[in-house]
């Protein structure tokens, strides 16, 4: 490790220990870092840190060394001293150092090329050369973009020697101590010193770091550090207690800028064989916010033991790892003409374990380009090979870095972390975390190892827990794939989420865990490749102990394997589990049209949210599939109650116009000029084969007036109520109608009639199954109609015989009918335009009494609707189409009427029986009238 020094300083000796061998020859064994950190050639060819920006703060880079990376970027920066001297710091400029050598006649200053930075940079990114020794492997991250900045300003060799002599003269007056005192160390310490010279040095390091940060580097290697002052951390803490208050320290400001820029800082621990590292590696102890961005580097030898010279991790253990420190590095040796001769030399020091770590960060950044700097750091730390005492210890920290393991993903996160995945990826390492992990990004992340997690939040994309996983709490707002995933406390999901089951078992709820289901569900297609009807494809949720679940799914993603074979995957919501089972469609060969439509709907509903939650319907579905017990639900879901009601309404509107014809007939053959009358009708229809009963009640108030012998006007206001009853439904149809009629007699016994009808209706219905309310709703509508009729009158022997033919046009409109309920239907607004042909014949005989008369009569009407044989409607339940049709056809209807009218003075009364014949329905009307 390079020690902070000027030309030389007796209290700050060079820490990078060099064997200073001559340039490596072909016979020499080369010490490469790759085997020790388990970076194989195949792995190195795959991940070389390509494109990752790294920084090195050092000096003596020897940028013309032929083994240097082609991606080396020397930087230039400048600094003005308090005296106004402008210093230029050019990393490409050759730099010299002088070494004092004691002789009999004094101390001689021997100059040499400074090569420390070259050795550091080479470990990171040097090109390989298999012709050197037994094979030089080059840098660990050959593809990295390497930015280098120096802390030594441009000086000629003469200037370097001159400055060294001045330092040597100043040093003669100081006590020559093997171990400097704490006060003397404080005077010369980079962070603690208040000396002017050290202030300038702090500014030099800060200026270089800031220049590197200007280039947006991912990590900065720092193979420099003040001496470790003590093995006792309490002594260290007391020594550096003042730095926390020094807010104007430019070096600390640069360090903080790196943290704010999400740049990692790697610091060599130092080479004093102390139990505590140098202060730069301890900075998170005094500034906890730095821990996520800093790594302390110790060195191990080729036996993977702590190197004899290396400081221990000590108090930096939680952010400390080890790497090889005994390596061959790039060097240049000046010849007699002071021109550099380039090659390799073997050196030792944490100066060289640090760049091995920095380069490894670049390799991991290329591998996990979507991870943050801290997450890359945590990956490197937590995948290290444990050395020394088990776990994170004071000597090795997390252990020896292991790239073979690290490229398979982190084994821990050391803070709450958000993983924003920008490409599909697999992590095969086991992952354990006591912190919250949040998955973001629209791509998939697969955790293939055995995982023990605290809190997982899936916010975006897909997280696949392929390996055996235990987790306390999961919140799923995107896509979570599980395979026997054990939940200890809680699983929650949103309506936009998807749960994907990868294996025979999905979620396992332990202890008192609660599973709250929502969103969609997907069963992996491979689970149904060989399944047959009746096979269980997966257990979606399994409850243990006192665990519970609630909610359900909005969708079960269609399975291609089953769809091709005409099979359906159903979910069975049971007390202690939710299973997915393969079944055939529901069938009933004996079902009628509405029953078949109901079956089609029920099969369609098996793929809707109604089927994907714990409910009576899901219980019925299980019974229907396992025991073939339909319980006539395929009839109950039908909306034929509405179709029957609309068919009845259309028929009723036709009958209203026909009644107006009867009123005109009665008024014309009444001796009074003006009559006012009231009428009440009751009807009961029964169609046993259709399981339909209709009760009809109607009250009318009318007025008739003869304008002349040939013309009669009639107006009728009616209120009617129909009650329909079916085994699984009931409906009430109310209507208020106004009919206005005109009868005019032509010449030669011909007559014509015209009638207009205006009506408003209100409709209510309720559908049920056992004790369950399937749906209930109400709606309103209107009717506009008219009839034109022409007839002929015969009057033989006091009989009145009137055959006639009418044509009706009726528009019936109903607003949309939208139910609420467990299987609610949604039906759009309806409009029917009917054209009816209505032939009719009426017979009446009048017998005169002393003060009145009695008139028996018979009427016969026939309706034939020209457009549409039967009312059909289309509804939907849960987005699935349901076709329903009326069970009683009323498009052709025969109506017979027998009655008697009694006239006494100015009073009239009438009673009649009305018999209507439609297919499978025989209604009887009982009518009473009172005329005045």
From Swiss-Prot:
Q: Does the keyword Hydrolase apply?
A: yes
Where is it mainly found? membrane
Which Gene Ontology BP annotations are present?
A: protein processing
Q: Which GO terms describe its molecular function?
A: serine-type endopeptidase activity
Gene3D superfamilies linked to this entry: Autotransporter beta-domain, Peptidase S8/S53 domain
Which UniProt keyword terms apply here? Cell outer membrane, Hydrolase, Membrane, Protease, Serine protease, Signal
Signal peptide span: 1-24
Q: List GO terms (cellular component aspect).
A: cell outer membrane; plasma membrane
* EC number per UniProt: 3.4.21.-
Where in the chain are disulfide-linked cysteines found? none
Q: Which PROSITE patterns match?
A: AUTOTRANSPORTER, SUBTILASE, SUBTILASE_SER
Q: Where in the cell is it found?
A: Cell outer membrane
Please tell me which top-level EC class this enzyme sits in: hydrolase
- The active site of this protein is located at 58, 116, 351
Identify the residues that the record assigns to the Autotransporter domain, covering every copy.
669-932
SMART domains with a match to the protein in the record: Autotransporter
Top-rank lineage group of the source organism: Bacteria
Peptidase S8 domain location, by residue? 25-407
Similarity remark: Belongs to the peptidase S8 family.
Report the protein name in the record: Serotype-specific antigen 1
